[in-house]
Regions:
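Short alpha-helical segment that forms part of, or immediately flanks, the ligand-binding pocket
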Residues: 82, 104-109, 123
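A short alpha->beta transition loop at the rim of the catalytic pocket in nucleotide-sugar-dependent
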Residues: 89, 109-111
């Protein structure tokens, strides 16, 4: 088993989705209706997430008044993550590796717009509502997301439904049960 779809290119295996408490994250207050979109990036590993390029582009957009950028200076304690996601309209996860992780799942379950590198995921889960980006195109992707604000509600719902389908634990339990019973 592999926990992220990008690993399937390196080994024979089956995707075993990571598990979050989808209903807990869905209980976070509805996305704020900020006049200026609030964008959150809280990397666990800055190099693997492409944070240098993300910071550079998002600071330019913040200076231009297009967004408000939340960027914790250090790794965020798990207890603080819900309040940061609650304040955000858009969450940017990793842009370097073609996979998404816990932060993306939490943000999707909370009905936030998520941007990340989904290169490998598109091959096996094309319905994933994460906006694809890499460091080279993050500025244009952010502009596209901001310009399509009318779609945010339906995209937030799609994110919630995606996490409910793949990350609430039932699919993972079913796959593990089948494996353990064989």
């Amino acid at each position: 088993f592999v926990t992220t779809p990008d690993l399937l290119q390196y080994t024979r295996g089956e995707w075993l989705p990571l598990v979050i408490d989808v209903e807990y994250w869905n209980s976070i207050d509805a996305r704020p209706n900020n006049a200026i979109p609030t964008v959150l990036h809280m990397p666990t590993n800055s190099k693997l997430k492409g944070s240098q390029q993300i910071d550079s582009e998002l600071m330019k957009l913040e200076t231009a008044g297009k967004i408000r950028y939340i960027r914790p200076e250090k790794k965020v304690a798990a207890s603080l993550v819900p309040s940061l996601i609650e304040k955000s309209d858009i969450v940017i996860d990793g842009l370097v590796i073609g996979a998404y992780g816990v932060t993306s799942c939490q943000a999707m379950a909370a009905r936030r717009i998520v941007i990340g590198n989904t290169n490998e995921l598109g091959k096996i889960r094309p319905e994933c509502p994460i906006f694809h980006s890499d460091p080279a195109i993050i500025s244009s992707v952010i502009h596209d997301v901001i310009d399509n604000r009318d779609a945010w509600k339906s995209l937030g719902e799609a994110g919630y439904q995606f996490t409910k389908k793949y990350h609430d634990g039932s699919l993972t339990a079913s796959k593990l049960s089948g494996f353990l019973d064989s």
